[in-house]
Amino acid sequence: MAKDRSGQIELTVTIAAPDDSKDVKIWIPYPVSNNVQDISNIRINGNFSQSGVYGEKETGNLALYAEWTTPTKDRAITLTFNATARELIKKEFPAVESNIPVEIKEYLKSTIFIPTDGKVKEIALSITNDKQKISEKARAVYQWVVENTVRDPDTKGCGTGEVDIQIVKRSGKCADISSVFVSIARAAGVPAREVFGLRLGKKDEEDMTGGHHCWSEFYVPGYGWVPADAADVRKIMLVDKLDLKGAQDKIGYYFGGVEQYRIALARGGRGYYLSPRQNDGPLNYFMYPYSEVNGKSLEWLAAQTDLKYKVMFKAH
């Protein structure tokens, strides 16, 4: 039976803006239930003028949107919900793979954030040219990423996930390492995307403000989406001071497996527009709260300056 973790998550966001401003907006990732997580008892509180939950067309990701249209002091919003997350193990790959469904082929596309040409293509071909099945190619890409990237604890937030930089630098945090996996996988003909989420505390009560996490998943026809978290392998290796040999159990586990201490907030989507559409250009990725004041975005990458947030977890 799959292991699970349950608790209450309380996300509080405050926005520093001029008291007389009439144009302050916030978008917060809004989690939903799926086969490995149950989200319930959602409550929204704050001194905003109005709010709503909106879906983004391309990815289907949801956002809690709120705005302040009258002069206000101390703008704040709190999203509280109950979550139960289950461990996911998907390692029973089919002996024969069918064709990639049409609706999944978009996860093979090259984008400005997820390039599949140049150095990325070169690496993809070099490590998968003797592999036939998608699951085998994905494993080869995963192994390469684990062996050829390192976690940089000084990287801000979860990193920017800029593959053109990371394919040379090969160091960063979870968005960086996961984006490298997605790029190389796509270049090798493996449908892949990022998963943007939040860790659940392991203690009865825990501050999880620094708990945002990005991992990846790939698609095997006839089997579905499969998790792969090379970024967590590299984090564990850094924290526990493990070399590749000492990390073999973790390397094996995180290909096709993720533990119960996380929920997904959003999937895919890089350089896209939220709903309602933000004013200050496309957003790199949607995992942290995003805010605009008078049409200009506040620093959102775990900045904790004008846009501040706190995440508290309380176990059930």
Model region roles, listed by residue range:
Residues 26, 141, 216:
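Terminal peptide-recognition signature
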Residues 28-32, 81-85, 95-97, 196-198, ...:
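A mature extracytoplasmic/lumenal domain signature
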Residues 1-88:
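Intrinsically disordered, low-complexity N-terminal segments that are enriched in acidic
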Residues 84-87, 152, 171-174, 199-202, ...:
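Solvent-exposed loop/turn segments at secondary-structure junctions
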Residues 76-168:
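Acidic low-complexity segments
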Residues 137-141, 170-185:
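Active-site nucleophilic cysteine motif
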Residues 249-316:
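Low-complexity, Gly/Ser/Thr/Pro-rich intrinsically disordered linker/tail segments
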Residues 179-277:
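Hydrophobic/aromatic-rich core segments of domains that either
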